Amino acid sequence: MLGAEVIDLSMLKGHKMLNIDSDVEGHFLTSCAGGMTVDTVIPVTWQKQQGYGAGLTVTGLEGGHSGSEIDKEHANANILMGRVLKYLSDRMELAVVSLAGGLKDNAIPRECEAEIVIPEEKKAELSDSITELEKIFKKEYAVSDPAVCIEIKENGTGEYEVLSYSSMTKVIFYLRNVPLPEGARFISAGIHPWYLTREDYP
C-alpha cells in the first residue's frame, strides 16, 4: 500500500487497475475491495471531578483483517465500549477520562480501553454491572467471539480531568452508533461468500 502511494504513474498507459492479491503463496485473486479512512473531530470540554477512578478494557475479541475476516461477524471493541459506557451512565453518575481503541484502520478493533470516574459508593455496583454486561456479550458473541471479556482496573480515589457531561454523551452516542461504514456492505444471497461494494449496483 505504501509503495502504491509513491508509484510513478507516468509510465502507465491504462486507466483501470485490477487487484491481484492473495495471502497464500502461488495463489492469485482478481478482485476489488474498498475501504475508507475517516478523521472525525468531536468538540469537547473538560472539567475537574473528584471520585473513584477505574480502567475498563473490552478484550478477548478475535479482530482480524477487514477483508479476510469481514464475513465472520466479529465484534467491534469500540462499539462494545460505547454500549458499556451507555449501560453504566444509565445506572450511575459517570465521567470519562480517556478512550482508546483499535490499532489499524484496516482491521476490526479487538480491544478498547476507557478510564472512568464514578462515585466512591458505586464501586460494588460497577463490578456487578460489568459482570452482567460480560454475560450479555458472551451470549451475543458465543460463536464469533467466545472469549470476549471486560476487565476492570482500580485507579483509586482522587481528582481527575474528565469530559463534561454533554461532551461525554456525544462521544458515547458516536461510539454506539458508528456513523461510518462498518462491516460488510452487501453479501449476496445467491453466491456465498460474495461481497459487493460497487457504487453503481442497482
Question: What is the predicted role of each segment?
Answer:
Residues L9-S10, W46-G51, D105-P109, E199-P202:
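Short glycine/proline-enriched loop/turn "hinge" motifs that connect secondary-structure elements
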